[in-house]
Amino acid sequence: MDGQLSLLSPTSSSSTSHSRKRLTKKQRPPSANHRTSSSFNVESLRIDAQSLDSKRSASSLRQGPNCNQSPSLARTVSVPVSVPSNAPAHTKASDLSLPRSHTTRSQSANRPYNPTQTIPTNRFILSPASSSQPQTQSPPYPSAVASTTVTSSRNKDTSKQYDPLDSCIGSFDQNKLSTDELIGAPFDGNAILSRIEATKLSAAPAPTSTTTIAHSNNISPRRVAPPPPPPPPALSRSNTDSKAARSSKPSKSPKSTISNKTMGASSFRHSASFSSAEQLPPSEKPSKSESSSSSNKRHSGDGKESRVPGMLRKKSGFSGFMNSLVGSPKKPLISAPENPVHVTHVGYDSNTGQFTGLPKEWQRLISESGITEKDRREHPQILVDVLTFYKETTEKPQEDQQLEKFHDARATDFRSPPVTGTAPLVLQTGVGYAHGPMSPMISPPASPRFPQVGHEGSFENPRAPPPVPKGPGPLPAKDINLIPSRPAPKPPAISTRPLVPPASLPAKDSGIGMPPPGDEAPMPYLPPKDNVQHMYQEEHRNRSRSNSRTNGAAPFSPVQASPLHPIATANQTAAYQQQLLQHQQEQAMAQAQAAMSGQLSRAASKRQQPTPPTSQHQHPRQPDINGAPRMPQTQGAAPQASARPRHRPRQSNAIDVVASLKRICSDGDPREIYRGFTKIGQGASGGVYTGHERGSNRLVAIKQMNLEQQPKKDLIINEILVMKESSHPNIVNFIDSYLCAGELWVVMEYMEGGSLTDVVTFNIMTEGQIASVCRETLRGLQHLHSKGVIHRDIKSDNILLSMEGNIKLTDFGFCATINEAQSKRTTMVGTPYWMAPEVVTRKEYGRKVDIWSLGIMAIEMIEGEPPYLTESPLRALWLIATNGTPHIKDEQSLSPVFRDFLYFALKVDPEKRASAHDLLRHDFMNKCVDLSTLAPLVRAAREARAQEKARKGQ
């Protein structure tokens, strides 16, 4: 056979070539002898090919000799052959007389015959198919007549080979080996035929295939045998024979009745080498699950094909499932958003120098403002700040702007002892400033060290400036409307923060000049006034959150440790004071908590202001949003307030305001007390009249307001309290107030001379006269600052003169429209020509904003108008923010001392700016003249105004 295997007869070679598609031919190792089977016919080939297709072909080998129920098993031809157990290792199959028997329906293994070494009958080679499975051993079998078996389990892994294992030949009756155990056993025709013959003669019932299968299923033959050394490559035997034997099941195939001769030939032909099994892909090898069912028979060549469709189906199903999860193109469509709202976001493109996302209104303002593109590129942030400020000021009602002026305008007295109480620290209004009245009204918490929570502008720095006075409300007929419509910057006063101890307050307010010792001694508020202020401030704070324009944190006058001075009104306001203080404290705490959580708007913080410690037992007072100094309440009141942090419902504000007004207003009807009402102005919620007091015939100014039409009732209370506490020769005095038939009547001192605006418009003033006006104004500011009040609207329109030349500050909200002379500038709502740069740019500010305004007013007295008055309001704001100190047209004509005075008053940096106390000591004050010298100017201005009105009347 010379290295080639002749398995098939010439007549059958053609038919088997297409059945067995994976025939392999191997070179015979030199030492290997061949076993062949010679007799074979076409019929046996067909049977063999079909049996190979059976997945259970491996089970027929063992069943063959035992299944006597099959007719094919009964017909066997046995040729006894004597094979000694110690036969030579090399013996040709042809030398042995091998019986041929048809043992099974088909013992097919369509594999080429591969040469193998002949080994003793009691030693066998483990087939690759079963090499990976544990093997069992059986006791030795009688040498010549033993049936050759190997206890091995099929395994799909055919890549490994093992050396021959000692396998004892056992009786099928004694050791019922499983079907899988016969896989890969070397084919020994002699032993098989001998066993079949013995079975036939004995006529003993053999176990059925069912029993055998059960045995194989119940008794696991997979015992791990010690791994033998690797065998020679040539000594590998295919399990084809055993598979072919197992594949035949007599009861299921009619072809099991073929002749013995044919079956015998088939059996011998299939005792091929094991090498073919190695070459089979794992997918073509029958598995145990496959061997359990013979109904689904597949050919060796189309085994894979039968699986592929199922696998593809599974894969496609799984892929479809994954696609549905990950990103299938069949996604549900999402509808477009409904009722979308586009929020404009203004940005700046540094490449093009253009703003993006500007609202149309802002674009129009910029185009009409006269601000060049170059300027916009150089200061983009300032432009945004100015636009925001301008929009806020122009959109607020004038009345609101007027009334919010003193909101939260108090600063803490840094010199006062720290509060010892545990209640939340509330700065008290009227507290003297450590820096003196000139120091800004910034409340200590507002100072850089104590960021204000919820303060307007707090996003920029801890104590953002309170909004500029909101809109120039119906200010006095004068230009009060020029007051920036934006709520006056909230006093630096921060919402009361229980966590900030008075001691922790900054030693100085930002931008506050150091006052000369004792210069600005804190002025204690009278208890009744403070209490009233507390009520009013509380009310004001509730409503001024968003639009209150604080006049700056009013410095809180320190409540002296000594008992407060009793006041006649103390009894009247004591009960209200306690109630108001508690309510304010609750609001302050709630606001502080909300601010810490980012819930409060910056405007809300404007209203809140810590009160300075009033005494050793200082009761934390809520910041008077209105800026009116508050009376420190008993310690008991403070803890109570802290216990109830929540604000009262906003709905109750109107009721609270009315109740508060009743407590602070006098009883009676003003129409019975005053006579001769003459209307001189009109505000948003009422008119301004002059009248004479019955009996004394004193001329007074009366403002009548309808509370139902007043949007900021709490601000009204604040203004009343501020004026009550601000009795000073240089401040328009508050006389009385009445609440009658739902209308509030406020009676104030009337200044017949009109405003300084008329004087500077129709007259040229000397430096001495200018110095006198500045001195009187500084004195009034010093007093306000000592009370913790920032006026924030110092300008010629709010400086009133008497016919004798006396000068007083006005516009505490109620005097806004008293002077009809201001009607000229009423249309210029919110144009802050006198405002400090820090206010325009929405930065933190303090009491020194009033000093800047005083310097601008000095220029106004020199030139007859403030700088940039001829510019558009928006451009004026832009120039104030970018130019800083304005340019004086004829500066060289001024004396050096006057220029020096202006230099310190108009410092852009509030820290370097002089305070009211500093300027009162400036050498320029030496040039002051007697106030009586102003009387002629006042009369001349009145005459000129009358003539102008007469011309207009014609």
Curated annotation (Swiss-Prot):
<feature type="compositionally biased region" description="Low complexity">
    <location>
        <begin position="265"/>
        <end position="277"/>
    </location>
</feature>
<dbReference type="GO" id="GO:2000910">
    <property type="term" value="P:negative regulation of sterol import"/>
</dbReference>
<dbReference type="GO" id="GO:0000750">
    <property type="term" value="P:pheromone-dependent signal transduction involved in conjugation with cellular fusion"/>
</dbReference>
<protein>
    <recommendedName>
        <fullName>Serine/threonine-protein kinase ste20</fullName>
        <ecNumber>2.7.11.1</ecNumber>
    </recommendedName>
</protein>
<dbReference type="GO" id="GO:0007118">
    <property type="term" value="P:budding cell apical bud growth"/>
</dbReference>
<dbReference type="GO" id="GO:0008349">
    <property type="term" value="F:MAP kinase kinase kinase kinase activity"/>
</dbReference>
<feature type="compositionally biased region" description="Low complexity">
    <location>
        <begin position="1"/>
        <end position="17"/>
    </location>
</feature>
<keyword id="KW-0963">Cytoplasm</keyword>
<dbReference type="GO" id="GO:0001403">
    <property type="term" value="P:invasive growth in response to glucose limitation"/>
</dbReference>
<feature type="domain" description="CRIB">
    <location>
        <begin position="334"/>
        <end position="347"/>
    </location>
</feature>
<dbReference type="Pfam" id="PF00069">
    <property type="entry name" value="Pkinase"/>
</dbReference>
<feature type="compositionally biased region" description="Low complexity">
    <location>
        <begin position="245"/>
        <end position="256"/>
    </location>
</feature>
<feature type="compositionally biased region" description="Polar residues">
    <location>
        <begin position="33"/>
        <end position="42"/>
    </location>
</feature>
<keyword id="KW-0589">Pheromone response</keyword>
<dbReference type="GO" id="GO:0005737">
    <property type="term" value="C:cytoplasm"/>
</dbReference>
<feature type="region of interest" description="Disordered">
    <location>
        <begin position="440"/>
        <end position="562"/>
    </location>
</feature>
<dbReference type="InterPro" id="IPR008271">
    <property type="entry name" value="Ser/Thr_kinase_AS"/>
</dbReference>
<dbReference type="GO" id="GO:0000131">
    <property type="term" value="C:incipient cellular bud site"/>
</dbReference>
<feature type="active site" description="Proton acceptor">
    <location>
        <position position="793"/>
    </location>
</feature>
<dbReference type="GO" id="GO:0044025">
    <property type="term" value="F:histone H2BS14 kinase activity"/>
</dbReference>
<dbReference type="GO" id="GO:0001402">
    <property type="term" value="P:signal transduction involved in filamentous growth"/>
</dbReference>
<dbReference type="GO" id="GO:0005634">
    <property type="term" value="C:nucleus"/>
</dbReference>
<keyword id="KW-0539">Nucleus</keyword>
<dbReference type="InterPro" id="IPR000095">
    <property type="entry name" value="CRIB_dom"/>
</dbReference>
<dbReference type="GO" id="GO:0070301">
    <property type="term" value="P:cellular response to hydrogen peroxide"/>
</dbReference>
<keyword id="KW-0547">Nucleotide-binding</keyword>
<keyword id="KW-0808">Transferase</keyword>
<dbReference type="GO" id="GO:0007096">
    <property type="term" value="P:regulation of exit from mitosis"/>
</dbReference>
<feature type="compositionally biased region" description="Low complexity">
    <location>
        <begin position="127"/>
        <end position="136"/>
    </location>
</feature>
<dbReference type="InterPro" id="IPR033923">
    <property type="entry name" value="PAK_BD"/>
</dbReference>
<dbReference type="GO" id="GO:0035556">
    <property type="term" value="P:intracellular signal transduction"/>
</dbReference>
<feature type="region of interest" description="Disordered">
    <location>
        <begin position="1"/>
        <end position="165"/>
    </location>
</feature>
<feature type="compositionally biased region" description="Pro residues">
    <location>
        <begin position="224"/>
        <end position="234"/>
    </location>
</feature>
<dbReference type="GO" id="GO:0007232">
    <property type="term" value="P:osmosensory signaling pathway via Sho1 osmosensor"/>
</dbReference>
<dbReference type="GO" id="GO:0034063">
    <property type="term" value="P:stress granule assembly"/>
</dbReference>
<dbReference type="GO" id="GO:0010629">
    <property type="term" value="P:negative regulation of gene expression"/>
</dbReference>
<dbReference type="GO" id="GO:0043408">
    <property type="term" value="P:regulation of MAPK cascade"/>
</dbReference>
<feature type="region of interest" description="Disordered">
    <location>
        <begin position="587"/>
        <end position="655"/>
    </location>
</feature>
<dbReference type="GO" id="GO:0007121">
    <property type="term" value="P:bipolar cellular bud site selection"/>
</dbReference>
<feature type="compositionally biased region" description="Polar residues">
    <location>
        <begin position="57"/>
        <end position="75"/>
    </location>
</feature>
<keyword id="KW-0418">Kinase</keyword>
<dbReference type="GO" id="GO:0043332">
    <property type="term" value="C:mating projection tip"/>
</dbReference>
